[in-house]
Amino acid sequence: MAATEISVLSEQFTKIKELELMPEKGLKEEEKDGVCREKDHRSPSELEAERTSGAFQDSVLEEEVELVLAPSEESEKYILTLQTVHFTSEAVELQDMSLLSIQQQEGVQVVVQQPGPGLLWLEEGPRQSLQQCVAISIQQELYSPQEMEVLQFHALEENVMVASEDSKLAVSLAETTGLIKLEEEQEKNQLLAERTKEQLFFVETMSGDERSDEIVLTVSNSNVEEQEDQPTAGQADAEKAKSTKNQRKTKGAKGTFHCDVCMFTSSRMSSFNRHMKTHTSEKPHLCHLCLKTFRTVTLLRNHVNTHTGTRPYKCNDCNMAFVTSGELVRHRRYKHTHEKPFKCSMCKYASVEASKLKRHVRSHTGERPFQCCQCSYASRDTYKLKRHMRTHSGEKPYECHICHTRFTQSGTMKIHILQKHGENVPKYQCPHCATIIARKSDLRVHMRNLHAYSAAELKCRYCSAVFHERYALIQHQKTHKNEKRFKCKHCSYACKQERHMTAHIRTHTGEKPFTCLSCNKCFRQKQLLNAHFRKYHDANFIPTVYKCSKCGKGFSRWINLHRHSEKCGSGEAKSAASGKGRRTRKRKQTILKEATKGQKEAAKGWKEAANGDEAAAEEASTTKGEQFPGEMFPVACRETTARVKEEVDEGVTCEMLLNTMDK
């Protein structure tokens, strides 16, 4: 039969090529380059044979394929094994395999050797999955094995027409009974399955026989079941191409995304999504080391790097490395490039960071959005507000490691260490003024801020004077400090500094913004809060005792010691340190003044008595006794009236009279 006739053509090969379907036309021969091509129509017998060739049915191609004889050429050949695999689309995992789409490629020629008993065979398997293997030899010069991944294979469809130079012989696959044996049930199942399946090809390359230089390419013909609700492959490709085109148009349009919560806008979707997470309290990313949560994976990764000490972002200009890319960019701008991309539109100010530009713009607008919840203080940035809140809480987180003095600011602590404990620290003097600074970097900042020429006019806060140098402005404003410019609206109090007026106003309003965190007691001044905290809540506090060098008496306050030292050793009454002693001293002074006044009146009476008006003197003495019963003179004093008269005439003083009374 066909097998014997094909065996005669041992040195010929067949070429499979996709042909366009041409209905209502007969056979037509074309000769080109010595190859005969022929198109035909299907006959009823061929349609019957189509059912028996179910293993070669392809639902993807709807065109006819012809098998044409051509001269053979001697070259290296490669064996291709075609396998048909049945599985559903849900179970398909396209890993390490190449999907071959079905499209026409004229530059590829697939050559099939003359079929023989060992060339084309069928292995019978389960009824549900029928496997077929076809060995195909491809010439290397026509198509290299390395390009097989993109090779497009066309499955045999229906009957195959085999033509020779002398005669035309139609060979049906159904007639090759020696090569293919199909059971009727398997044919029906496969025909039904192929109508609802999509055919995919997968190519695998492996070495051939050790004795030959052949490479075996395994081509898997996979039938994938299509879902009813899914579109066809052509529709899917069209929709995909359309969506890709629309995405490109959208991308080219560069639309702007606006936040509905705030005024944020961005031209990038990723930046907009990242911003929207700031308005939600959701933090799904958890650090496994400290259990801190973060909004994004990037923030979590940067945080974990702080635990591990990893610094993945390295500077190309120096040896420094950083945890985040933002720190690296900021470092390069400050140290290497000196770039200041953020510029103010109202003046010539430029900054390395956007946050500093925002803070600077508030100096033009006067905006102070960060308000203290305990007083009227407001700041342009959060850092100064946090620093201000320490004045209410009394917190001093920075401690000097030498004398253990605590400070609210790190800068104040550094200056303290340099000035108080830096004996051998070099000093830098400003060439424009008498300022001496411990650090060279601070000297540069001082000269830039105070002595640099400013194109903008700097106006005095107290008058209409204008300057172009900040140092000159400060020196001018000091001339206004001797004035008591701040006057109280409620009384006649006036002061030189605004902070003094603020503290005074609290005496009228009753405001006590400084609260003790331990006992909730409130104070008008911060100094009173600090003294209260040290005295009652600090276990390590040792009160300072101020001792008098003359009498050795101790005082808790220096002012009390100063008052005492003025009177100590003069024979006068010694002042007490406590509040009770002060009240007693004031009461005694009041009594002494009243006694002095009464004594003057008594002296006047005695003078009148010395002149012969005895009755007037007794009346004056009686009046004085009624006013000050505790200071009544004894009767014996009347005997010394003449002597007192002489002393009064000589200009007696009150102190002399009191000394006389003591005697």
UniProtKB/Swiss-Prot annotation:
PROSITE patterns on file: ZINC_FINGER_C2H2_1, ZINC_FINGER_C2H2_2
Ranges of compositional bias, category Basic residues: 580-590
Family the UniProt entry places it in: Belongs to the CTCF zinc-finger protein family.
Signal sequence range: none
GO MF, any single term: histone binding
Entry-linked Pfam families: zf-C2H2
Stretches with biased composition (Low complexity): 608-620
Main location class: cytoplasm
Any one GO CC term of the record: nucleus
rRNA-binding in keyword set: no
Keyword field: Activator, Cell cycle, Chromatin regulator, Cytoplasm, DNA-binding, Metal-binding, Nucleus, Repeat, Repressor, Transcription, Transcription regulation, Zinc, Zinc-finger
Biased composition range(s): Basic and acidic residues: 24-51, 594-607
GO biological process: establishment of protein localization to chromatin; genomic imprinting; positive regulation of DNA-templated transcription; positive regulation of gene expression; positive regulation of transcription by RNA polymerase II; regulation of transcription by RNA polymerase II; transcription initiation-coupled chromatin remodeling
Protein name per the record: Transcriptional repressor CTCFL
Zn finger limits (C2H2-type): 257-279, 285-307, 313-336, 342-364, 370-392, 398-421, 428-451, 458-480, 486-508, 514-537, 546-568
Region (Disordered): 24-55, 221-250, 569-630
